Amino acid sequence: METLIEVNKKEQDGINIFEFSGELDETNADKTFAAIYEQVGDFTNTKIIFDLKGLKYLNSKSIWYIADIFSNVEENDGKMYISNCDEGVKDVLELVGITTIIPTVDTVEEAIAELKS
């Protein structure tokens, strides 16, 4: 049975904001991130925010996908931020070192301000 995850994409000032709600695990990670890659399309000069406010759990495969998306963004002169992490999710991301690689801020508004500067 597939675990529930919802990802809503919105755009603001040319920035792709992906809002996550639910849990990312083995049952839904491939499908979820395939949809994100498709929605981003060409990574050239793209600006992305992953708003993790509603994300309650993520597994190692999901972390790999997040790192891979960041790598694609960076290689193509784009920028990416993570925002609004739940404490448990933030602890996991810090533990594996993602927060030392991908800029992480408290709010979407902070990420937008950084991406506009």
Model-inferred region functions:
Residues 103-107:
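Short acidic-hydrophobic, aromatic-tinged amphipathic segments that line or gate anion-handling sites
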Residues 2, 110-116:
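Short, charged, intrinsically disordered terminal tails
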Residues 3-35, 52:
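STAS-typified acidic loop motif
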Residues 26-102:
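Amphipathic alpha-helical interaction surfaces in cytosolic regulatory modules
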